[in-house]
Swiss-Prot record:
InterPro entries: BRCT_dom, BRCT_dom_sf, DisA/LigA_HHH, DNA_ligase, DNA_ligase_AS, DNA_ligase_CS, DNAligase_adenylation, DNAligase_N. One of its GO terms (biological process) is DNA replication. GO terms for cellular component: cytosol. Changing residue 139 to A: Lack of activity. Zn(2+) binds at residues 425, 428, 441, 447. One of its GO terms (molecular function) is metal ion binding. The gene is ligN. NAD(+) binds at residues 60-64, 108-109, 137, 160, 196, 311, 335. Pfam families: BRCT (PF00533), DNA_ligase_aden (PF01653), DNA_ligase_OB (PF03120), HHH_2 (PF12826), HHH_5 (PF14520). NCBIfam families: dnlj, PRK07956.1, PRK14351.1. The keyword Manganese applies. Its EC number is 6.5.1.2. This is DNA ligase. DNA ligase that catalyzes the formation of phosphodiester linkages between 5'-phosphoryl and 3'-hydroxyl groups in double-stranded DNA using NAD as a coenzyme and as the energy source for the reaction. It is essential for DNA replication and repair of damaged DNA.
Amino acid sequence: MSDADVDAESNPYLRDPPTEFEPAESLSREAAEGQAALLREAVREHDHRYYVAADPLVSDAAYDALFSRLVALEDAFDLDTTNSPTNRVGGEPIDALETVEHVAPMLSIDQSTDADDLREFDERVRREVGAVDYVCEPKFDGLSVEVVYEDGEFVRAATRGDGRRGDDVSAQVKTIPTVPLSLRGDHPDRLAVRGEIYMPKSDFSDLNARRVEAGEDAFANPRNAAAGTLRNLDPSVVADRPLAVFFYDILDASARPDSQWAALDRLREWGLRVTDRIERAEDVAEAIDYRDRMQAARDDLDYEIDGTVIKVDSRDARERLGEKSRSVRWAFAYKFPARHEVTTVRDIVVQVGRTGRLTPVAILDPVDVGGVTVSRATLHNPDERAALGVAVGDRVRVKRAGDVIPQVVEVTEDGGGCYEFPDECPVCGSAVDRDGPLAFCSGGLSCPAQREASIGHFAVKGAMDIDGLGEERVAQLVDAGLVETVADLYDLTADDLAELEGWGETSAENLVAAVENAKHPSLDSFLVGLSIPEVGEATARGLAREFGSIEAFPIEADAEEDEFDAFEERLTTVPDVGETVARRVRDFFENADNRAVIRALLDRGVDPEPVESGGDELDGLTFVVTGTLAASRSDVTELVESHGGNVTGSVSGNTDYLVVGENPGRSKRDDAEANDVPTLAETEFEALLAERGVAYPPE
């Protein structure tokens, strides 16, 4: 018997179920499979009633008895438990989170705290598609995920990531009670939905109390707790923490409802949890009123929200409005203003970032700001601090920018103190360099603060991608004296690591292997890993294309001034590298300690792959892509750039072609029309590349 054959109405484990059973071993396999199928159906129904409908049918004790019986049957007869509710207790730890492509793009939403911006959004919508109704929803302050079902069964879950790709967190999400492993009712064959994973505020307080009692650090806020939990590699840890989810959008389905309101009804019918704080609005005034009422009620909710989302209800109108490259044009997030509280400044310290940037930070009397205890707040930069006039002893108004980052807004009462920004780095004593309003430590990688932060950054995805080397482990390696610079990572042995607290033979060997596997990065990834100021992934790709190999950079110990002059001049020819960025990159390479670290990496066998140009077949051509293509956006960019072309994010008079894939955004097409830029369907794009000897899609 399969679970699908079970008739819920005749299931004996739904109402007044037995709590005692004969030994599992006394059943035949056929009888055990039949009873297990009934129990799975019953446990799923009880989960739905308890977590989603808030209308339980049985007592906790009865539920526990049914659950235990199901576990006993599955264990005794080695039954298939792929999507059994018993899987929620968590499985074996995994080595790392893998990146997966989303079924459909998870685009962002334009946002503002200003009602006039919402009114402008409404005017544009009505101008383009006429009168519409809106659906108003809370803007949950959690972690957005895509959950995929096939034939009604849970298949996969992934974080939002960059909107196109995210981390596979299937093992973690399966443990969350409010995520059904099997859909209810007349569900579509294929379904991808979007939801927000969060930690209830009441459970967050209890979790933090337990962590403090156990000698562990408390989480800063429920969102951090949810995000940290979901990315934990051990599903049993996730299962032990109180995560929950609200679903609010259908990303892809074999049959899609014709409105958002209908989509929410379908989600409920399929057993997917939807908040009851959703309303319709006939005009923008009603949407503003909804937001004001939600702001007044936010403290009474058991989940964090930071605003409301206003969505065009009609799917037809949505399709006509289209999308931008990163956000939809049919929804708007009307956010709450940041919360403010007044407290006293007890000290001002200077924080040193991984690129050497010095940031003044106010140490405060602890104050509760929106449910989070704030004891530190950024002052941004020396000029901002001076403009605010903040000094020790002042009473200041503090807010959480975006309800996340604490910052000082103003001085409300002068405490009579004074403060001067240091002219030396507080960590290493090197001179402070000023660049406009910003201040930087000139010590480079010889500065311990920059060194430790740069080691952690060296290992991240997009740089050297060293699995298992997070911030805590980096701090442990530095504290133990095993690592002073990133080059020292390549001297580590399993014996060194196995002696450290919390390490075993397997984890030590895994890290050594991961470091060894990171000896042949692409040149742009290597440059990202060096923590060069102003150099992110896009700029690193440009530098890699321009210079071709690491040896083309001035990295020798005896590099002279004229070499750096020529280097800086060449930098300004790289797309999107202006004079300021060129100067910051020059400063990095002009620092002898930084060059020594690069040479030490090369001496230890790190060999960044030279950029081998695929030719100049696309030289001088600039493309913009909208919609979904057969190849990922990053693969298209890499292909075009390797053959001398350029891919940008927006259409202008300098664009040669707009490549249009599936579900394209309207704004780029409008911009292309306004600038007389030709558009290419994907097949036409493929033909154009083929004419120039470039194969597409890339292998």
